């Protein structure tokens, strides 16, 4: 199984596009700035609420994004030899347009809690170490895993995959 982080690896960063669209610099913060992902998401949701932004604003930003140069060709090539899984800290509620552009690989990510008017009230993390847990689960049922990502929070799961191959 070939496992990839999505944003920064195959696609641009969604929150950077939200920052560009809204002019709100705070949306550019990443886990480099706020290492705890829960704290980072709480910060982003507070920014959204204080600026009266909802899920449609994020979806509009995502609809403007395309895959990074070469990502589609890379995925098409690797699918000939591997099952592809996207292990991402993104959310199902706005990842769909990018999944379509990638040819609908399996996406393992989080969910948002959205009310009827489109306001984001919270989020549901699958697990605090979901990427690492997914790799370990695949390995526990006999799969060899390759993994790639672009950020500090990818180190645990990419090193777990590398350990298995050595």
Which residues does each PLM region occupy?
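A short glycine-/small-residue-rich loop at the edge of a beta-strand within enzyme catalytic domains
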Residues: 62, 122, 126
């Amino acid at each position: 199984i070939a496992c990839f982080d999505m944003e920064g690896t195959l696609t641009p960063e969604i929150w950077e596009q939200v920052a560009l669209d809204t002019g709100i610099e705070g949306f550019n913060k990443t886990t480099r700035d706020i290492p705890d992902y829960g704290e980072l998401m709480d910060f982003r949701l507070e920014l959204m609420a204080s600026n009266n932004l909802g899920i449609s604003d994020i979806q509009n930003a995502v609809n403007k994004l395309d895959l990074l140069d070469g990502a589609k060709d890379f995925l098409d090539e690797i699918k000939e030899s591997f099952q592809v899984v996207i292990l991402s800290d993104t959310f199902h509620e706005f990842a769909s347009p990018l999944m379509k552009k990638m040819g609908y690989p399996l996406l393992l990510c989080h969910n948002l809690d959205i009310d009827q008017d489109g306001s984001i009230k919270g989020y549901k993390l699958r697990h605090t170490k979901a990427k690492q847990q997914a790799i370990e689960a695949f390995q526990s049922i006999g799969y060899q895993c390759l993994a790639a990502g672009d950020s500090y929070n990818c180190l645990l799961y990419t090193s777990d995959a590398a350990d298995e191959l050595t």
